[in-house]
Amino acid sequence: MRPAIRIVPALLLVGVTAIWGWTFVVVKDAIASYPVVSFLGVRFVLAALVLWLIVLLLRQRGRVALAGLTIGVVLAFSYLSQTLGLKGTSVANTGLITGLFVVFTPIIDRLLWRVPSQRSTWLAAGFAFLGTALLTGGAPRGFHLGDLFVLLGSVGFALHITLLSRYAAAGPLLLAAWQMTAAGLLLTAGAVLTRSTVLPAPSSVLPALAITGILASAIAFWVQTYAQQRLPASRAALILTMEPAFTVFFAFLLAAERFRLLQAVGATLILLALFYSELRQRAAIGAAAPVLAPSTSEP
């Protein structure tokens, strides 16, 4: 794919990470008065309803139910594992371990689909993970049982990215709709089984549910699926590491939280990893392009 064409899905994915970073600030207050699993369940059910409405309006058809439901199960598992882990470990550990998805993605890509990993991919992933570590507070603060759940969630997020890149071409809208359906139903079932309050949600939480359900889930996952049909999984994972950078930025801008020097360095490392990856891919495309010898024949 030519660089000019590839930059559009990359920018769309950057936009998705910006939305997720912004909504993290919105969600923070909402889950203080509403169970996390219930919030996630209602959020994804709302997203599924919005996407199915769009599917009906656009009269979309396709045989992607199995792939979409499978990806949705992986997504629900990832969120549940991360949420369970967060209850048993620190926020810093959660952010740091979750950031390992950028390392796990090329590994899973190679194991499942035999996608070769270049040295530049690993170098960029290393820089991005180091940047994530600085953004989330540096070194882990001791080992907790919750860390294992967060680690499983990180593997799940990496698998989610690789599956999207593999099956997104089958139909981004339908795939996103089935994905939200599976995730919403499973997370809602999880909330019911844990006897968490699902409905009615507190009125103070409704704006956050609407924002995250429609914008950060229905639209964002649709756009992510569309973008990943044109991006390799390892490239998508690198771009998605920008989410904590946007979270810190919007927390500083909207919630008056302090922006520390280490966080600025971390955000810079993530950006450098993205630029390095882009330059290496452009160089690889240029080297692979055929060289046409000038014609010596007269017209």
Ranges and model annotations:
Residues 25, 47-51, 105-107, 111, ...:
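Transmembrane alpha-helical segments that form core, pore/gating elements
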Residues 19, 23-24, 52-98, 106, ...:
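Specific transmembrane alpha-helical segments of multi-pass solute transporters/efflux pumps
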Residues 51, 73-75, 117-137, 153-157, ...:
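Hydrophobic transmembrane alpha-helices of multi-pass small-molecule transport proteins
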Residues 8, 32-77, 104-108, 156-160, ...:
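Transmembrane alpha-helices of multi-pass small-molecule transport proteins
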Residues 4-10, 33-37, 41, 60-66, ...:
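Juxtamembrane helix-entry segments on the extracytoplasmic side of multipass membrane proteins
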Residues 50-59, 82, 101-123, 245-265:
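C-terminal transmembrane-helix exit sites in multi-pass transporters
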